[in-house]
Amino acid sequence: MDYPLFTKLSAEFFGTAILMIFGNGSVANVELKNTKGHHAGWLNIAMGYGFGVMFPVLMFGSVSGAHINPAMTIAQAVNGLFPWSDVLPYIVAQLLGALLGQLIVYITYYPHYKETEDAEAILGTFCTTDADNQKVNYFLNEMFGTLVLVFGALCCLSLAWGKQDYAAASIVVGFIVWGLVTSMGGPTGPGLNPARDLMPRLLHAILPIPHKGSSRWGEAWIPVVAPIVGAIIGAWLFVFFFAS
């Protein structure tokens, strides 16, 4: 069934919001002071992001494709898998969804933001940074991580077995994200998604959070550009080797 564009955009909006609630919500639970999950560990965060992708793909994959990621949308368009006419509306819906999702995380954890004095921990609940402050490493990590994500997701959801059992394919995509966060999350987070980084970073800059420190706009282009580059390569690999 082909849904109207408004319905597809609604799916992208709510899907991206859910991604933020599960993903950055899990970071807030681990990093912010005096939460029930304080210091619960990296696996808790990886699980949050895995579920944060899995559930929207299960819920909205048949409606909009559940891109929930501007890099995925642009990459599919560049490689002829998605109409260019829908790219800008999809990206706007994703950006607004990320904004809403992060705002919900902030409101939910508001008392703990006030109690937390670690500026890096606070920033980490909004956006990515490079653990070693090396921009080249930051770019490469985000590029390769998104390449694997997009290549893996397209293989799961577009090949014959995934089309026959979309629910199973969606679950596997969630595990790909879970695995990527555990394996490639050390250097940068990772972001793997321009909307997941840009809009929360904007909120971090705007919101009156005590002890929040810098929003680090000097490196903010990296988790926007690098995922797009990686996604385009990942989608190209899928088209070259498997799409016929």
PLM features per residue range, with description:
Residues M1-S244:
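Membrane-interface helix-loop junctions and terminal tails of multi-pass membrane proteins
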